[in-house]
Amino acid sequence: MNEVIVREKQYVFENIDVRYLIDKDENVSMIIVPRELSEQIQKQWNMPIPKFDARDRNMHRWDIGNIAYAHIFGEPIEQPGKTMKANTGFTFFEQEYFESGKGEGVVTYLKHIDGYVIKHTLTYIKGGFTVETEFVNNSDSDVKIDMLSSFALDNLSPFQSDDAPNKYKFHRFLGGWSMEGRRLSQSVEELNLDRTWAGFMCGNEKFGTRGSFPCNKYFPIAVFEDTDIGVCWAAQLECNSTWQMELTRFANTFSFSGGLGDREFCGWVKNIPKGKSFCAPKAYVSCVRGKVNDACNALLNMQPNADELSIVFNEYCTTWGKPTQDKMISYCQRLKELGIKYAVIDAGWCKAGCEQDGNGEWNIDKTIFPNVKEMTKQMREMGIIPGIWFEFEVTTDGSVMFEPRYDYMKLKDNGKVIKTRGIRSYWDFRREDVRDYLYEKVIRFLKENGFGYIKVDYNGNTGLWADGAESGAEGLRRHLECVREFFIKMKQEIPDLVVENCASGGNRLEASMMNITDLSSFSDAHEAVEIPYIAANLHNLMRPSKELVWAVIHSDDDKDRIVYSLCAAFLGRVCLSGDIDKLENWQYDILKRGFDFYQKLSDIIKFGKTTVCGNRGKSMRHPTGVQIVIRKTESEMLVVYHGFDDSDGEFEIDISDGYIFSDSFYADNAEIADGKIIIKDMKPYTSGALLLERK
C-alpha cells in the first residue's frame, strides 16, 4: 500500500465549508461543501493506494488536482488534442485570509520554478464565491501562456468514497437564436466519462462558445450534481469573448474548470512581459444542498440586481423598422395613460426605410425625425424617458463608414477585413480613433438630444480571431474587452443612462455584459408562442429583474392572446410593443389591469427563487403541455402558468406552508383549496397568474 499524505487548511463562510488540500509535493486543490454536510466528506486522500491489479474494478485511485490550471507555451502536453489540464508545475507558496469592503476570503499563492506566480483569490459573497486567477511573471524574461483557468473545482464529489457509478449528472445550458436557455442534463456515463479500468487516461468533456457571440452555442454556466447526496456545484464565467469549460475525470473524481478558450480550443496564446501579469476572466462558483435551480440561484444572487422594474415600450414590433417622430409622439400619448416609463426608438432612424442597412454614420434622418430635441422634450413632459437603438460596434453596407477607405479602422483576420454575410464589418475598439469617433456619434449624441435610454444591439459574430496581437484569439479578447470598457464609459459620462444589452436577442446574456448594463433583451422571439418557455429557461441564467421580455399586442388579438403575452412578460421585465395606437378600450383595460398587477411583483421578481414545473414538452417551437413557473420569497409566491398544445390535465401546487391569496390576473381556472392551488381545464395558449402572501 502507498500512503497519500495530505494536509488540510479549512475556512468556514456562513453555510459553506472550504478546504484546501496540500500534498507532500505541495500540489494544492480546493473543495467547497455545504457546512451541514461537512461530516459526510469521504476523505479519499486519506485512503491507501493499493497495489495495481488490472482485474480489480474497485481499485482505489485518487488525484489531488489543482486550484488553478495553467500551461506555458511550448511545454509538453500530457494528453494533446484532448485536454491541456495536467499537473501545472505550480506549487503551494503561501495563503492568507482577508476581510475587506468587498467581502471576506482567501488568497492563495502558487509558485513555479521559473519564477512565475499564480494568485488565486476566493471571495465570499452572499452564499457563493467569486474566483479571480492572476498569472504574474516574476521571471527575468517574457513568457507565453496558452491556457489559464478562471476556476477549478476538483475532487468532485468529496461525498463519495469511490468512482461513484451512476451518481453524477452534468448540466449545461444551450444557446441559439430565439431558442435560448434549454437545459441539457446528462449523466457522466452518457458523456463517456466512466473511470477507466486503470484509473488513468480518463476522459473529458470540453465545451464552450467561440467568437463574439458568447452564448451562441452554450451559456457560460454549468452545474455538476451528486444525485446520491443531493448536492450541486455550479460555476459561471464573466467572459464576452471565446470561453470554455471542461469536466475532466482524474481517477476516482472529477475536475470542473473553466476560463478563456485555450490554444487547442481556439488558438489562444498570450505574451506576458517580465514584471507584468494577466488576469483570467472572473468566475462565480457555488455549492448547495438542493437542485440545479438552487445552485444557479446562488450564482445569480452574487450579481447586481435591477434598481427598478419600470415597463419599457419599444416600437420595433409596431413600425417594423420604420419609426418616425410623429409616430413616437402619438404612441407616447397613449403610453402615458398606461404609466410606461421608457419609450425606445429601434432600428431605422438613420435612413428612412432602412432598418439595419447603411449604419455607421449615425446621423438622424431629418425627413422622419425633423426635430429630435423637440421630440425628446415632449416625451419627457409626458413623463416618459426617451430611448434609442444603436448597433455602434459595426458598420453596414450602404454607409460611408463601410467603404474601403475606412478599412484601416476595422477588425481584420489574416489581413482581411472581417465581414459577416458581406454586409457588416466591425470597428476595432483597440484603436483610439475608433473610440473617439464613437464618443462623438454615440455618447455626445445621447447627451445633446436628451436621451436617457440606449438599446445596444449587435447582430453579427466576428468569428474566432482578430489580427494585432500575439494570437488571433487574444486579439479578439482584447477588442471585446475594449468594447466592454466603452459600455462602462457611457455610464460614467451619463450616470442616469439606462443601458440595454442586446445581441440578436440573447447572444450576450453573460455576466460580464449583464453586470454593467441595466437590463438585457431576452431573445429575438418577438411574437412567438415559445416566449414563456424561453423566459422561464433564462431564470437559471440571469436575474429576471434584468430579463426584458417582449409583449407584442396587436389590434386583432383576443383576450386570451393578450393575457398570454402579458403573463409571459411577467416572468421578467415587460417590453411592450405592437399596435399600441390602434387598440380598443377593452384591450387597453386588459393592459391596465395587467400593469397594475405587475407593479405588485417588484420584490418577488427581484428577490425570489424560481421553480419550473408542469408537463411542458421538449419542443420550444411547437410547445405542448402546461408550464407552471413558481417564484418564491419568504413572504410571497408568484405562480404564472401557460397552456400550450395538448394542455389537458389538472395540476396541484402545495401551499400548505402558509401562503394565502393576494391577487390574480385572469387566473379563472385556478382555485385555492385545502392548502393547494389547483389549475384545471387549461385550453391551448391561455394563461393566468396568481400572487400569494404568507399568513
Indicate residue ranges for each PLM-predicted region.
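Carbohydrate-binding surface patches
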Residues: 219-222, 618-657, 686-689
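Short, well-ordered beta-strand segments enriched in hydrophobic/aromatic residues
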Residues: 129-137, 499, 636-643
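C-terminal beta-strand-rich structural cap/linker in extracellular carbohydrate-active enzymes
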Residues: 672-695
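Short Pro-Gly-centered flexible turn/kink motifs
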Residues: 92, 270-289, 685-693
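Glycine-rich, aromatic-flanked loop segments that form ligand/cofactor-binding clefts
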Residues: 58-94, 218-243, 285-304, 341-347, ...
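Active-site neighborhood of glycoside hydrolase catalytic domains
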Residues: 369-371, 408-561, 571-573, 582
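Aromatic-lined carbohydrate-binding/catalytic grooves of carbohydrate-active enzymes
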Residues: 309-443, 449, 453, 464
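Polysaccharide-binding surfaces and accessory modules of carbohydrate-active proteins
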Residues: 2-249, 266, 666-669
